[in-house]
Regions:
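A detector for short, charged/polar N-terminal pre-domain segments
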Residues: 1-12
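Short, Lys/Arg- and Gly-enriched loop/turn segments at beta-strand edges
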Residues: 65-69
């Protein structure tokens, strides 16, 4: 599991999270994968590219999980 620390921000947009954690090569690829329903947030399919991810949430994609702290 990848741990992503929010630091000083309240949230990060879903497509940006996939990019900065290295699970996607670019934001464009991340947006496409999200739109195709391949990304889960807290166990539910998420299709909103700009979904606000906050501390305590779990994002899953391609058998990888990101814990946002």
């Amino acid at each position: 599991m990848i741990e992503f620390e929010m630091a000083e921000h309240d949230y990060i947009e879903l497509h940006s999270l996939l990019k900065v954690t290295g699970l996607c090569d670019s934001g464009g690829v991340a947006k496409l994968l999200i739109a195709e329903g391949l990304v889960h947030v807290d166990g539910e399919v998420e299709t909103r590219k700009r979904c606000k991810i906050r501390a305590g949430q779990i994002v899953a994609f391609n058998d990888r999980r990101i814990s946002v702290i």
